[in-house]
Amino acid sequence: MTDAGLVAHLRSVRELDDALEVVVDVGNDSDRTLHYVAEVRAIDYDPATRRLRLRLSDRGRQLVIEAAMVEPTFRTVEPHSEASLVLSLPRTIVRLAPQAERSPEPRFEEHRIADATEVEVEIGWSRTPYYADVRARAEPPEAWEDGTAHASLTVRPE
Amino acid sequence: MTLFIQSDATGAGSGNVDAPEAFVNLVVIANGDTGLGFTDLSPRIQQITYARTLGGAPPVRLDTLVNTFFGVNPQNIDIIIVPVLENFVLADGSRMNRRGITLSPAGSGLPGASLNSTTSCLVVYDTTDRNRLGQCLARAGTGGTRDLPISNPVTLYHELSHASRVVTNALLQVTRECDPASPEENAAITEENDMRTQIATALGVAPELRDPNIHCARKGCRGDGCCIVATVASGSHLSAEVDALRSLRDGYLRRSEAGFAFFGRLHEAYYGFSPEVVRLMAAHAGLRDVVLRRYVRPLVSALQTIEDYTLGGMRGAELTRQLREHGDDSTEAELALLDGDAAATADLSGPERELSATLIAHAGRDPYVRWALIDPLFLHRTARRAAAARLTNEEIGRTLAAAIDGWAAQLPIEDFWPSLTRSEARGELRFLADCLLVTADARRRFGMRLAAAFPDTRAIHAALADEPDFGEEDE
């Protein structure tokens, strides 16, 4: 009987015509079904180091006012088995640029994450399915996670 | 004139915002009012103009936003609508993917300010997913069924509701709470429903409104997850059996600390063995019907009867009739099996024997599974034996009530209790008294167990003394 958590292995990263495709293998060596977040909830990219971090978790997400708090997509991996997760991402991301002197108008910065040479993936997982916390003092969805599986891959520039 | 649309993004070239879509959404908010227009303030932002000619809540709100100087910054660029595409990410890395958010001005200290590099209030929403068909919100009047889509104009109006309170410094409390929604989200959803009503009226259809008490949503309009064995056995996650179990779980019990902690432990145990039950059902088609008829339906029936007694206030003959109405097709053989009677497996088929071995191995050993999923089944035996003894319906009802009280008092005690203050512990005891421990005898028996479990925790003992019937004298 084993009680290990989710294990992740980053199999491939490749640029397609309209997307950046990242394939992750997830493994479960335990005796019970494991549940994990199956979509990229956050993208961190440092253009200076060309390091791309994909977070399949809501850890680190700040509190904002938003139309709806959309829960992540979840999947399972059976005991003593593996599954593949294909993540399709935009090849470029756009974000608000920092401003040394604040002005009322936004400035954007655009980055080609398909140029990343180091890719990391973090996957939140749990031993039980996710059910929304309906208590008055509800905890955020990430409190459901029992752990985080990590994987990384160095991508050779073509 | 203080409402603007971002039409381009300096430094990133064109094509990263969809200003025409934002203007179309504003036209819908204005209910087609021809008084709405815009001027190019700069190559990057358009200024909205509005000489309103129509009534209704959304046009009036838009009129206020467009024609009031809120003084958010010296340039009077108070609110900028940023209609982004799906590749936009916030400064914390989170993706916009189908979201609509309001970022308070940088330095304001309000929610989202640290993600905003401007001195304006930014309303950012993803315009790529037309009609947001993949995003499902809680529909009003359904008890939380999440199957209500949200369109771009409704998303924008929801965010403008927030923005109006940000720029007037009237923001209500914002939390991460989903159900019930925080006061700020409740207010915005209530106003969002004005927009839904306006659109429905224009289309000549009945409005589909959102539940203001539930802020969270899911992708894909399926039901909330629940109870995989019942789902597979009944053939659908929307079946009456699954719906009943989900309603019992989320409608009341998981809202308290005691219920939430209990279900955390139950899920830990249940999802340790239920996939094996599902695999057995997949391998042996006949087992689905066995599980549904002999376990799932009798369990649902028993739990509904318990709810009728504890929350519905049913007593005596009425309770007896209600149990029969819910259905009682469990058999003594299954109960004997679950009671660990090895002889009861003699007549079972191979797959049934495998199933019962799995259930006995897990259900019999785990106190949470035993209390929540197995012991309620014995309510049927109680009723049958009382009927066999020729008791009246009134007497059978009293016997059932005593059995439920006995079962309720054995609620497994969780280790969260010592973390509570006296006041919080009192709140939990009151919750249990309202929904589970409905008689003085049940409260006294549970109180004694709780006191014995934590003999040195003063807050618990003080709370027990505070609450009537829980069995401790005041200090």
Task: Give the role of each language-model region.
Chain A
Residues 11-13, 39, 43, 50-52, ...:
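Generic beta-strand hydrophobic packing signal
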Residues 1-14:
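N-terminal edge beta-strand
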Residues 14-15, 28:
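Short polar catalytic/cofactor-binding loops
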